[in-house]
């Protein structure tokens, strides 16, 4: 009985936490569809088209775009 109550409380807590920390609960699916439509019209806007940097190329520590890791401003 205690375990069941604890599980119910945990599920309720996690559900409330999910709703409280959601980015945008209003029209969330609509925004996703608009973004997908924009990416279909403009393929360059898609994140799938971004090229990762090969080993030895210069990278940025804060926004690394390496295929592997960014170590001391160079891709590894």
Swiss-Prot record:
Q: Which domain of life is it from?
A: Eukaryota
Positions of the propeptide removed during maturation: 23-51
| Localization | Secreted
Q: Which GO terms describe its molecular function?
A: calcium channel regulator activity; ion channel inhibitor activity; toxin activity
Q: Return any one Pfam family short name.
A: Conotoxin
InterPro entries associated with the record? Conotoxin (IPR004214), Conotoxin_omega-typ_CS (IPR012321)
Q: Which GO terms describe its cellular component?
A: extracellular region; host cell presynaptic membrane
Position of the signal peptide: 1-22
The record's section on PROSITE patterns has: OMEGA_CONOTOXIN
Keywords on record? Calcium channel impairing toxin, Disulfide bond, Ion channel impairing toxin, Knottin, Neurotoxin, Presynaptic neurotoxin, Secreted, Signal, Toxin, Voltage-gated calcium channel impairing toxin
- In which tissues does this protein get expressed? Expressed by the venom duct.
Disulphide connectivity of cysteines: 52-67, 59-70, 66-75
The primary site where this protein sits is secreted
Domain text from the record? Answer: The presence of a 'disulfide through disulfide knot' structurally defines this protein as a knottin. The cysteine framework is VI/VII (C-C-CC-C-C).
* Main function: Omega-conotoxins act at presynaptic membranes, they bind and block voltage-gated calcium channels (Cav).
Q: Which family does it belong to?
A: Belongs to the conotoxin O1 superfamily.
Name of the molecule in the record: Omega-conotoxin-like TeA61
* Protein species of origin: Conus textile (Cloth-of-gold cone)
Q: What is the lineage of its organism?
A: Eukaryota, Metazoa, Spiralia, Lophotrochozoa, Mollusca
